Amino acid sequence: MIYLPTDKILFAGDLLWFGYFPNVREANVPNQIRVADRILEFPVRYYIPGHGHISSDRNEVIRMRDFLTTLYESIGKMVKEGKTLEETREIEEPLAKRNAGWRGRQFLSRATEVIYQSMRPVTRV
């Protein structure tokens, strides 16, 4: 992330995705949520995400953060309830509908799997 305080421009790279479902394949989702909170602390005129459109609207950051938070917390609850990955995928359709204008629907399916696998207890043999 690069922040230009004089110009109030924030180059976020893959930390922000506007108009796309975030690709969290290699991300630490709780950390990504914390980073979004940190980004919101900066006075920013323009956000330049790694994917999507340039924006001056901080609500874009909030929307992405809230999406990741909802996804992460929902999957965590389902893992604690002992749900399978297939049962956990039930959350995808409502989230896709809520963010109907976003592209990259395949990233939502991938995110569900990545987060689910990261929360499952490790079994030692």
Regions found by a protein language model. Name each.
Residues 1-77:
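Metallo-beta-lactamase
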